[in-house]
């Protein structure tokens, strides 16, 4: 016969409404939408996204710590849950651009102390990490000492250089161009974040065949406003993955 109902610690009256799971976008950039956080939240929620993990490296590249603090303040009261990461690679191309800010270990400590900052933003200078650059490694170490997750960007690395990146504690990558690279990163313990632009039948098949499903997720990365309004947000990436198998 039917089992007895379980006792609950808390009961919530849904008022004849439906309870549905929401999408979590674990790697994205709010600035790409060209919207204020408030207006982005309206669009994202209408597409089923309830949580985003945003790397504000464009804001930090211009306004530094105060820019990230201002963004955190603007996101705090939104109906959309926004977790920020501390931009790690500012400037993104040292010596090749004029930047309004420079992130070293002291600046990283200050960024991680901002309420709402939950991790290290994508480490884009993979060549510096692979070469053992002291400044870049000290930024990563500062974040690791806070016990936060460490986001990566390692599209060009394979083999020993990719292993070095993982050994530094980098947890994830969202630049997976092939099924072979996806399998290699999963084997090394990365969380693999797959963007819509990287989805194809080979990658989707590798995702389906992967022995570790809970370290694969779909993300948006950058969604310009016209595409956001025309296609949606993370829901479009999910729909595309389903279409591909």
Sequence positions of predicted segments:
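Divalent metal-coordination and catalytic microenvironments
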Residues: 16, 27, 48, 71, ...
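Di-metal (Zn2+ and/or Mg2+/Mn2+) metal-binding site signature of metallo-dependent hydrolases
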Residues: 17-41
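Hydrophobic faces of well-ordered beta-strands that scaffold small-molecule active sites
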Residues: 22-30, 52-54, 82-86, 118-122, ...
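Glycine-enriched alpha-helix->loop->beta-strand junction motifs that scaffold or abut catalytic
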Residues: 49-50, 116-117, 147, 164-172, ...
């Amino acid at each position: 016969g039917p089992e007895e109902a379980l006792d609950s610690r808390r009961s919530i009256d849904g008022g004849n409404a439906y309870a549905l799971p929401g999408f979590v976008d674990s790697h994205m950039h709010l600035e790409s939408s060209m919207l204020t956080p408030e207006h982005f939240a309206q669009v994202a929620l209408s597409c089923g996204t309830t949580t985003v993990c945003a790397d504000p490296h464009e804001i930090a590249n211009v306004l530094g710590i105060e820019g990230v603090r201002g963004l955190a303040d603007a996101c705090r009261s939104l109906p959309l849950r926004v977790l920020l990461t501390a931009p790690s690679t500012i400037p993104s191309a040292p010596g090749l651009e004029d930047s309004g800010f420079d992130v070293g270990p002291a600046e990283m400590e200050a960024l991680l102390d901002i309420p709402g900052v939950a991790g290290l933003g994508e480490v884009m200078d993979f060549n510096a990490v692979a070469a053992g650059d002291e400044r870049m490694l000290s930024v990563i170490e500062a974040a690791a000492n806070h016990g936060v997750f460490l986001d990566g960007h390692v599209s060009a690395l394979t083999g020993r250089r990719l292993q070095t990146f993982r050994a530094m504690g980098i947890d994830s990558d969202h630049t997976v161009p092939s099924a072979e690279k996806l399998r290699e990163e999963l084997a090394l313990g990365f969380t693999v974040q797959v963007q819509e632009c990287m989805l194809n039948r080979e990658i989707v098949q590798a995702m389906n065949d992967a022995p570790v499903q809970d370290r694969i997720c779909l993300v948006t990365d950058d969604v310009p406003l016209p595409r956001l309004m025309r296609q949606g947000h993370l829901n479009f990436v999910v729909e595309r993955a389903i279409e591909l198998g």
